[in-house]
Structures are given as C-alpha cells and as structure tokens.
Amino acid sequence: MKKLLCTILSLTLLLTGCTIGNGNIRIGAAGIGGMYYTFANTLAGLCTKEDTGFELEVKKTAGSAANLRLLSSNYIELGIAQADLIDAAYQGTGVFTGKKCQNFKAVASLYPEACQIVVRKDSDIETIDDLQGKKVSVGEEESGSELNARQILEMSGLPEDLIKTKHLDYTDAADKLAAGKIDAFFFT
C-alpha cells in the first residue's frame, strides 16, 4: 500500500507537469491537528522511507482556500482542498469571486468530508440556533471549515453576527473548548 501511494504520487507529478527541480515539493496541508496536515505528513514520511527521489515539504496553511490560492501563485506544488472549494476556485465563485484559479489539476479524492460542530459534553448546545450569543470558532480564515460554517449558518437562518466568531485552528479550538473559553467549534 505504501509503495502504491508513492507510485501514484510520482506518476501524478510526472503527468501533471510538476517540476521537481531539486527534489523538494511543497505541499499545502492545513492547520496542525487536522486531517490534511496528518495526511500530508504521513505521505511525506512514506516518500522519504520508500526513497522516491524527492521529499515533500509540508507547509502549514489555513486550509483549502489558502491551498488553492498558494497553488495558483506557484508557492506550493501540491495542495489538499475540499471539492466544493476546488469548484469555486475554478469557476471564480464564492470566496473566489473575481479571483478565478484554473492553473491546477485535481488528482484524487481522498475521502468524503463532513462538517461537525463540536461542543463540550456538559454543553446546553443541541441545535444550530443554540449557537446564538455563543463564542464559536468557525475555523481559520481561508479554511474549508470557515466556508462550511458560513454555509451552515446561512442555510439555518442564523446570521453570523449573532454569534461571537473566532478564527482558530483545530488544536487551539479544542484547547479553548476544553478550557471553557469558547462554546463550540466547526470541524471539517
């Protein structure tokens, strides 16, 4: 399985025209504690272990939208992003209105992503409406979590200005939730 992943990555780089140059490839992940960061580090470790001839340099980013922007500006050679944000970047809609990004190729779907709202076990928050007046992390700016949080709040009819919005990465959000400094956080 490990060799298969490395082979797929190697073929991907070859077929998409990604220039390896000195053998280092920057991959945009997301915040520490999230699945993108974990996946990118695992992949980087496999590439090193399997002696692929190149090394992946994992870059901590805000997440999906940031990765697409960094990919478009050639700061990174690979990036992990949610499918809905890839479509928005390509079409120039949503957070990418007026900033169409089309100089990338989608390589693979890694896994389906569900957006979750995390609260403490002793919380009285049971519905989205219960977030009103609460301190809630919607994720880092330019993250898929932030986009999903905004979509969920809009679709539920709860204006974002009725919650006390914070922009925290997953690790900080979990720590602040455990300490009682925020009431909930969105996790995609």
Q: At which residue positions do the language-model features occur?
A:
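Ligand-binding pocket segment of bilobal, Venus flytrap-like solute-binding proteins
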Residues: 68, 76-80, 162-164, 168-188
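Pocket-flanking alpha-helical
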Residues: 44-45, 59-98, 173-176
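Positively charged n-region of N-terminal signal peptides that target proteins for export
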Residues: 1-4, 8
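A structural signal for short loop-to-beta-strand junctions that line the ligand-binding cleft
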Residues: 97-110, 115
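Structural recognition of the beta-strand scaffold that forms the well-ordered cores
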Residues: 57, 79-81, 116-118, 137-139, ...
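Bilobed "Venus flytrap"/periplasmic-binding protein-like clamshell domains
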Residues: 23-50, 54, 113-179
